[in-house]
């Protein structure tokens, strides 16, 4: 959970650092960012496979009692979900307060659905963080999240979903993230 949050946040920090401090307009290239994300998500998926086997190998189908056994295929599936979620949250951070406003119901839902105190506490901390940040990030924004914050939030969202065993529920729970990511993909593909 912490590895996902801080790991994806670190990737965002490197990107922001290269943009702001080193004055490189692009920051990390898309290829560099994807390589770092693949490496991090592979590490997290392997650790989950070793220590929390059921959260990786058995995918819960939302609103059913069905747990689909995907065995070793859980690793690439989780990698795809981690990379997709962190990038979708990052893409949502375009307008003042949008990413934080979208994250509020997501973290509230995690608090409600959590089965253990650690997940509930972490989701509560993240909820408090985005609520506090929203005050400064609402229109007109005086503080911006950048890739550091948006990638860290994406890592926290996907980390909680994996830890709680509800990764496929992210498609519904993070509907705005999914819609934003699909919108960007369609726009890039059509131009």
Regions found by a protein language model. Name each.
Residues 14-29, 185-191:
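Cytosolic, membrane-interface loops and tails of multi-pass inner-membrane proteins
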């Amino acid at each position: 959970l912490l590895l996902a949050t801080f790991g994806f946040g670190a990737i965002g920090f490197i990107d922001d650092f290269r943009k702001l401090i080193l004055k490189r307009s692009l920051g990390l290239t898309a290829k560099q960012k994807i390589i770092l994300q693949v490496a991090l998500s592979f590490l997290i998926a392997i650790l989950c496979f070793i220590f929390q086997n059921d959260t990786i190998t058995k995918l819960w189908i939302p609103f059913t009692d069905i747990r689909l056994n995907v065995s070793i295929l859980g690793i690439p599936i989780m990698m795809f979900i981690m990379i997709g979620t962190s990038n979708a949250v990052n893409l949502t951070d375009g307008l003042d307060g949008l990413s934080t406003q979208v994250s509020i119901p997501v973290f509230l839902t995690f608090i409600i659905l959590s089965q253990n105190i650690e997940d509930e506490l972490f989701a509560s901390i993240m909820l408090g963080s985005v609520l506090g940040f929203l005050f400064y990030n609402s229109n007109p924004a005086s503080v911006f999240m950048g890739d550091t914050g948006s990638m860290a939030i994406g890592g926290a969202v996907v980390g909680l979903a994996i830890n709680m065993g509800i990764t496929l529920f992210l498609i519904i729970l993070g509907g705005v993230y999914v819609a934003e990511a699909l919108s960007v993909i369609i726009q890039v593909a059509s131009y």
